[in-house]
């Protein structure tokens, strides 16, 4: 019951507050106020839980309160009640199924948007496509030696999705990034070898040359086409030993 277990956080928070302080005898301590405070703490945690599930399950607040009351009065033990255990398991199964369906929908949409974007991009002026399927447009070729996959490059870049959303940008951070070229996604490794130091290039990376069906975190869905604008600031060849 991964989602359900969030409720135990309330108890842990109270324990942490109490154990972190030393209380002297205080005859003015208001137990009713303390009881209410604990109730609001648990209620806040419960509200977060209910809100996080609302797209999938519409809970009945009155029944939630009934359950709380019964548990507090010792009328029910969730650890021993098989009916409640089965209900909690069904909640988790429903949430997992909904999460899977949502992920599949997002991946499908990302693929469709990417396919459409690449088809249109391919028609653009000066756009070329490599044998692997990498699409690119060179703004400036740069000068010097051809970049190798084992070289360390220093670049400024902006990465976008087909819908225009920027998911990462060293330009916005104001801090270039340095890395060995064969340690990144295939599209980058291939794309930067098409220019030299000082070069500027835009490349469009199909999912199979990027993060594929896995995606990358919350910002890059599975099956995403990636658009990068890159400027090569410096190139350091791998030293020969």
Swiss-Prot record:
InterPro entries linked to this entry: PPIase_dom_sf (IPR046357), PPIase_FKBP_dom (IPR001179), PPIase_FKBP_N (IPR000774), PPIase_FKBP_N_sf (IPR036944)
First and last residue of the signal peptide: none
Enzyme class, first EC level, given as a word: isomerase
PPIase FKBP-type domain mapped to chain residues: 150-241
Record-level GO BP terms: protein folding
Protein name (Swiss-Prot/TrEMBL): Probable FKBP-type peptidyl-prolyl cis-trans isomerase
Native organism taxonomy: Bacteria, Pseudomonadati, Pseudomonadota, Gammaproteobacteria, Pasteurellales
Reactions accelerated catalytically: [protein]-peptidylproline (omega=180) = [protein]-peptidylproline (omega=0)
EC assignment: 5.2.1.8
Species annotation: Haemophilus influenzae (strain ATCC 51907 / DSM 11121 / KW20 / Rd)
Function field: PPIases accelerate the folding of proteins. It catalyzes the cis-trans isomerization of proline imidic peptide bonds in oligopeptides.
One MF annotation (Gene Ontology) recorded for this entry: peptidyl-prolyl cis-trans isomerase activity
Keyword annotations: Isomerase, Rotamase
Family: Belongs to the FKBP-type PPIase family.
């Amino acid at each position: 019951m991964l989602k359900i277990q969030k409720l135990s956080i309330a108890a842990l928070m109270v324990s942490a507050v109490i154990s972190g302080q030393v209380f002297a005898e205080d005859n003015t301590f208001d137990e009713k106020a303390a009881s209410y405070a604990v109730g609001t703490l648990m209620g806040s945690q419960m509200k977060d839980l209910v809100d996080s599930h609302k797209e999938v399950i519409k809970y009945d607040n009155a029944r939630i309160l009934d359950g709380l009351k019964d548990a507090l009065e010792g009328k029910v033990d969730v650890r021993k009640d098989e009916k409640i255990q089965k209900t909690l398991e069904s909640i988790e199964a429903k949430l997992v199924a909904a999460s899977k369906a949502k992920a599949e929908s997002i991946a499908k949409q990302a693929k469709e948007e990417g396919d459409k974007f690449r088809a249109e991009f391919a028609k653009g002026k000066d756009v070329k496509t490599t044998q692997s399927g990498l699409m690119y447009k060179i703004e400036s070729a740069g000068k010097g030696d051809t970049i190798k996959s084992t070289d360390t490059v220093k670049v400024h870049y902006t990465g976008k999705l087909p819908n225009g959303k920027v998911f990462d940008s060293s330009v916005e951070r104001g801090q270039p990034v340095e890395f060995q070229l064969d340690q990144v996604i295939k599209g980058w490794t291939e794309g930067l070898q098409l220019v030299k130091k000082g070069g500027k290039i835009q490349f469009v990376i199909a999912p199979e040359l990027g993060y594929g069906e896995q995606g990358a975190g919350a910002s890059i869905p599975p099956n995403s086409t990636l658009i990068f604008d890159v400027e090569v600031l410096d190139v350091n060849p791998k030293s020969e030993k």
